[in-house]
């Protein structure tokens, strides 16, 4: 299902880089990636052909271990600010482009917050998008469903179709999801 959605995408945002990044750029889909591990981001970027329509954004969320997971998870004001940067970075980057991704892959850190903020940003801009949350099954994602409704499932992934019918996501819900990450 993901490959079908990606092949239909005109613009693609992903939280977390890896194989999907390489596939998207090889398909020629304009891709914006947010990564929390600068070393992994560098390794992925080396595998992307020069001139590919790709932008890699590395968010400084503090010290990380494997998979870009924060070493320290107790929410403090400074950590919450850094973690919020990861969630907001792609939208801060694209706000003047007039482009909004029609496909968002949430496969990195702060998944609840990233899904909710992606939906919120689409609502603010009055556009539709599809949010694909990988590894959804077996995890606690009730805050996402509270605002976005029950997802369509594709294996262990969840697909949320965001449009005019979607309940408006308040900033406070995104903030709570970031705070509850730890």
Predicted regions and their residues:
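N-terminal donor/sugar-recognition subdomains of glycan-related enzymes
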Residues: 1, 7, 73-81, 166-182
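SAM cofactor-binding core of SAM-dependent methyltransferases
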Residues: 1-67
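Short amphipathic alpha-helical segments and helix-helix/interface helices
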Residues: 2-3, 21-25, 41, 45, ...
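Short, flexible loop segments at the rims of nucleotide/cofactor-binding pockets, characterized by
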Residues: 8-12, 78-84, 104-109
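Glycine-centered flexibility motif
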Residues: 18, 66-73, 108, 149
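Short, charged, surface-exposed secondary-structure boundary motifs
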Residues: 40-49, 65-69, 139-146, 160-165
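S-adenosyl-L-methionine
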Residues: 45-98
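C-terminal substrate-binding/active-site "lid" region of AdoMet-derived donor-dependent transferases
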Residues: 93-182
